[in-house]
Regions:
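C-terminal secondary-structure termini that scaffold catalytic or DNA-interacting sites
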Residues: 1-4, 243-260, 265-267, 277, ...
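Short, Arg/Lys-rich segments that mark the N-terminal edge of DNA/RNA- and chromatin-recognition modules
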Residues: 1-39
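Flexible interdomain linker/hinge and immediately adjacent N-terminus
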Residues: 4, 115, 122-124, 130, ...
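Conserved tyrosine-mediated DNA breakage-rejoining catalytic core shared by Y-recombinases
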Residues: 18, 174-181, 187, 191-196, ...
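Catalytic-site neighborhood detector that most strongly recognizes the C-terminal catalytic loop/helix
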Residues: 43, 180, 241, 336, ...
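Basic/aromatic-enriched alpha-helical hairpins
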Residues: 52-62, 73-141, 158-160
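Short, basic (Lys/Arg/His-rich) helix/loop patches that form interaction surfaces
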Residues: 134-137, 196-206, 215, 261, ...
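Short, charged phosphate-coordinating catalytic segments
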Residues: 160-172, 192, 212-241, 337
Length: 388
């Protein structure tokens, strides 16, 4: 059987331009004629380009270079409006992304996706860092780095989506280390330090803080607790209060899943006494203000900072309550799965952090035990020598 040679020009055509360069033409996916994205110095290179396009079409890997002419701004806005990579964004996250697009990323809105190069991204990154540093220069401790990290991370994520949509061939966000969170590990809030801070706070905050510690609550989850969430020594954590552009709204928990956390008996007894001595409906706030509305995380944080700084423990934040409670649970022998259930974590990674902290704390305790034991042994030996 004779084999017919494939004519690669049957798929397209080439012609020489007055400049001497060669132009390649071939049908687009809809069958309409289109030009290659660039011209070629030789006829052979133009023919090879046509052959490559044809092969990509057959493999299903073809990318129409014209698709990348879409401006970044409209593409990014549509990506956010459609829920990002997973098709759903939390209200707070969507508001953050919209603010970043309107702020640090505004200068890229009119740029075609395919026209954004790694050099462009580096120039934008340097320029934006200077702008953000200038904007926060009068705010003590502020650097603008967190905002820059958020903006770069969003830009990289959106351009990754453009790669998957075959609008661009590769992601131009290639700055090493940019967009990564490098927050230092928070200091360990010991029960002794916690007791000291709570003791320096007004009494109205004592029980809310102990509940947050014992149930490993996020501040927003503490705000959203209702009287009916407590039953038989445990609290049901179903919701949180978040703030979007200053407006507080109630949403499901951060992971979208509810959890039941058994409180330490001493704290459970305090909650029962609190509920028995106050009135309200099951959906009333567990910890209300004088006007009947729920306490706010802002007021709690303010009271905490004032008390902590007043006794020389300003390094601790109210958000350290959750970390401290989970670390203590790990020290008490909690397994990874048990810590995940109590904290509401989806993956084991976060739970392992608390177990690691517990291991470090256990090592400190062991060293102290060894030291105390050595002192006692020497005392016994000394007494024994005296008897002799």
């Amino acid at each position: 059987m004779s084999r017919q040679k494939t004519n690669r020009q049957a798929f397209g055509s080439v012609r020489q331009l007055p400049s001497g360069r060669w132009q390649a033409r071939y049908p687009d996916p809809a069958g309409r004629p289109m030009n290659a994205p660039a011209t070629f110095p030789t006829k052979r290179e133009a023919q090879d380009h046509i052959a490559g396009v044809r092969a990509d079409r057959m493999r299903g890997t073809y990318r129409d270079h014209r698709a990348g002419l879409q401006p970044f701004g409209p593409y990014a806005a549509e990506w956010v409006a459609n829920g990002g990579t997973r098709g759903r964004l939390a209200a707070k996250t969507q508001a953050l992304y919209e603010d970043l697009l309107a702020g640090p990323l505004a200068g890229l809105h009119d740029r075609a996706l395919s026209a954004i190069t790694p050099a462009d991204v580096r120039a934008w990154y340097t320029r934006t860092r200077k702008t953000l540093q200038k904007a926060v220069k009068n705010r003590p401790g502020a650097t603008g780095e967190a905002r820059l990290r958020q903006a770069y991370s969003l830009l990289r994520t959106i351009l990754n989506a453009a790669v998957k949509d075959r609008l661009i061939s590769e992601n131009p966000c290639q700055i090493e280390g940019a967009g990564q969170v490098n927050d230092p590990e928070r200091p360990y809030l010991s029960p002794e330090h916690l007791a000291a801070i709570v003791g320096a706070m007004p009494e109205k905050w004592h029980l809310p803080i102990r509940v947050a510690f014992g149930a490993h609550l996020r501040v927003g989850e503490l705000e959203a607790l209702q009287r009916g969430d407590y039953s038989n020594g445990a609290v049901r954590v179903e919701r949180q209060r978040i703030y979007v552009r200053g407006q507080g709204i109630i949403t499901p928990t951060k992971t979208g899943e509810a959890r039941t956390v058994v409180l330490p008996p001493s704290i459970a007894a305090e909650v029962e006494a609190h509920l028995a001595s106050t009135t309200g409906f099951p959906k009333s706030p567990m910890f209300p203000r004088r006007d009947g509305e729920a306490i706010t995380g802002n007021a709690l944080s303010h009271a905490w900072r004032k008390a902590a700084r007043g006794i020389g423990l300003g390094q601790f934040h109210v958000h350290d309550l959750r970390h401290a409670g989970l670390t203590l649970a790990a020290q008490a022998g909690g397994t990874t799965r048990e810590l995940m259930a109590r904290a509401g974590h989806r993956t084991a990674r976060a739970a392992l952090i608390y177990q690691h902290a517990a291991e470090e704390r256990n090592a400190v305790l062991a060293e102290r035990m060894d030291l105390v034991g050595a002192v006692r042994v020497e005392s016994v030996r000394g007494a024994d020598r005296m008897l002799r």
